């Protein structure tokens, strides 16, 4: 072979040779070109109150005694100016932030119902002995029975909160009363100046000497007004909602209207029969809301697993509601729209607690299903379906903290209770995308957007406060959630755990002393979460 031929063959082999380094470089290029899908972060609450972070769930952060930055079974929330109020049921107190918290777990400024932040006893530990004279029942078996005793500056199981005409009202549920301060309290343990439901601030007997009337209360829960004039109170264990047409001026001021009963002296669930449910009956109502612009009244009828809506504020006792949500009609009262306690669904409710309404729609805390439901428009038809669920990944889920025991996230809920909605209209440069469920069977979500060429309406800037009672915290949402997709095996829905089949959510361990012959909660019919 000539030298020229050998040279050509060598050049040909060199041209086809690829070094190991070059091969590695090509592999790296292939890897760089592969697109890694970005994980969509699930939207959750933006702020937590009562815990150091979103993962914590223990009452009083696991300590034996409370502090200025802890909560135990928080129930309701109120905001007035820059001030924030929370009813801390487990610690028998109301805590106040004089400046709205900006960081997780910020300490509060004031405490009502206790002398200081380390105290947590019901009525500050005051007790009395129940006998024939004090009970008014004439039952000798009650002689010597010890009960908690109220005084003017004590609180027992606080519930609803509202600032009305610049004055703070607190539903002191365990003392069967509503107390009012002459303004906004400025000192720890400051005493209120007026009481509803009792003759004076030292009494705490259920139904005011044992007689049901227009001025008595029995474990009241929610309170609301929107016009600093009409006051509504959910009188839970009297199975009615009381309405005052004007601001009370003295202790024991009588209400003007009763909803859920035919008269002011009646107090039976569903007017005497659990199955006698109708548009004018109630069973353990817990939440109330009055929208002054539309004059609509909203009542959470917890024992009947529904929300009732009156299109105009009732002027007379016993007026029937116009719309029902959570049931297909006014004659139904089954949990989860008749599907039972085991199965959450889009159309039903299971022991709901509170309702709030604004320009952006309606929210209901569906406590037994560990979720909050959202309607983009206030319902106008019976059984109208919600558009979005908060706290769960789908309408069919109901486990506390999505089944992870002892650990929460910014997106989960456990026993959600009272709520507060604050709205402010503001112009935004970009369109805020609002996640809404599709109507298909896969429960996929889509984004409601404005088509090109259309003018974008001002999007609501809001804060939704949720008293997440089971997680001993209050969470604040400022965006509607876009639930992340989770792969889930087809498995049977597990029944919610109940401690006492006969105890309602928000109910108390005290016996009902005034209806011995009444079976208010038949076994297995009204379980508590």
Predicted region positions:
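Short loop/turn segments immediately following beta-strands, especially the blade-tip
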Residues: 97-105, 181-190, 245-253, 310-319, ...
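Beta-rich catalytic cores
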Residues: 70-73, 90, 107, 154-157, ...
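Short loop/turn segments immediately following the C-termini of beta-strands
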Residues: 89-90, 99, 173-174, 183, ...
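Short coil/turn segments that connect the beta-strands within blades of beta-propeller domains
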Residues: 82, 166, 228-229, 293-295, ...
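Blade-level signature of beta-propeller repeat domains, shared across WD40, Kelch, NHL, RCC1
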Residues: 370, 418-426, 457-491
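An edge-strand/N-cap motif at the start of beta-rich repeat modules
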Residues: 30-56, 77-79, 84, 463-464
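Signature of short aromatic-glycine-proline-rich micro-motifs recurring in repeat-based ectodomains
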Residues: 61-79, 125-165, 209-226, 272-291, ...
């Amino acid at each position: 072979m000539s030298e020229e031929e050998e040279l050509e063959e060598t050049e040909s082999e060199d041209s086809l040779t690829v070094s190991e380094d070059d091969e590695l470089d090509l592999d790296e290029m292939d890897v760089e070109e592969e697109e890694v899908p970005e994980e969509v972060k699930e939207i959750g609450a933006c702020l937590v109150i009562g815990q150091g972070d979103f993962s914590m769930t223990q009452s009083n952060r696991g300590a034996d005694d409370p502090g200025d930055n802890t909560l135990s079974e928080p129930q309701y929330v109120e905001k007035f100016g820059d001030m924030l109020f929370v009813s801390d049921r487990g610690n028998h107190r109301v805590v106040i932030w004089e400046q709205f918290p900006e960081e997780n777990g910020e300490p509060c400024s004031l405490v009502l119902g206790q002398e200081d932040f380390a105290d947590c006893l019901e009525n500050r530990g005051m007790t009395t002995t129940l006998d024939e004279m004090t009970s008014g029942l004439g039952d000798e078996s009650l002689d010597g029975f010890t009960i908690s005793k109220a005084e003017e500056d004590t609180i027992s199981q606080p519930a609803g909160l509202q600032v009305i005409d610049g004055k703070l009202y607190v539903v002191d549920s365990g003392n069967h009363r509503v107390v009012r301060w002459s303004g906004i309290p400025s000192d720890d343990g400051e005493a209120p100046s007026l009481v509803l439901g009792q003759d004076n601030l030292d009494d705490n007997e259920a139904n005011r000497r044992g007689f049901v009337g227009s001025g008595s209360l029995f474990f009241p829960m929610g309170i609301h007004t929107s016009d600093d004039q009409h006051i509504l109170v959910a009188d839970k264990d009297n199975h009615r909602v009381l309405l005052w047409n004007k601001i009370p001026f003295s202790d024991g001021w009588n209400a003007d209207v009763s909803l859920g009963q035919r008269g002011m002296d009646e107090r039976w669930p569903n007017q005497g029969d659990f199955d006698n449910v109708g548009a004018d009956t109630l069973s353990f109502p817990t939440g109330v809301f009055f929208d002054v612009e539309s004059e609509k009244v909203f009542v959470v009828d917890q024992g009947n697993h529904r929300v009732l809506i009156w299109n105009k504020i009732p002027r007379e006792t016993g007026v029937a509601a116009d719309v029902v949500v959570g049931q297909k009609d006014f004659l139904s009262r089954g949990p989860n729209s008749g599907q039972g306690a085991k199965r959450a669904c889009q159309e039903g409710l299971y022991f709901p607690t509170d309702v709030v309404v604004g320009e952006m729609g309606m929210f209901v805390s569906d406590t037994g299903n560990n979720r909050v439901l959202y309607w983009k428009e206030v319902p106008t038809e019976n059984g109208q379906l919600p558009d979005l669920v908060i706290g769960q990944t789908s309408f069919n889920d109901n486990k506390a903290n999505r089944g992870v025991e002892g650990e929460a996230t910014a997106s989960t809920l456990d026993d959600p209770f009272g709520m507060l909605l604050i709205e402010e209209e503001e112009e935004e440069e970009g369109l805020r995308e609002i996640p809404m469920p599709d109507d298909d069977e896969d429960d996929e979500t889509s984004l409601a957007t404005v088509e090109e060429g259309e003018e974008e309406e001002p999007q609501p800037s809001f804060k939704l406060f949720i008293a997440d009672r089971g997680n001993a915290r209050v969470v604040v949402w400022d965006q509607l959630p876009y639930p992340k997709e989770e792969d889930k095996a087809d498995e049977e829905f597990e029944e919610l755990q109940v401690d006492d089949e006969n105890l309602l959510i928000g109910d108390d361990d005290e016996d009902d002393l005034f209806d011995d012959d009444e079976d208010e909660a038949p076994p297995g019919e009204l379980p508590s979460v």
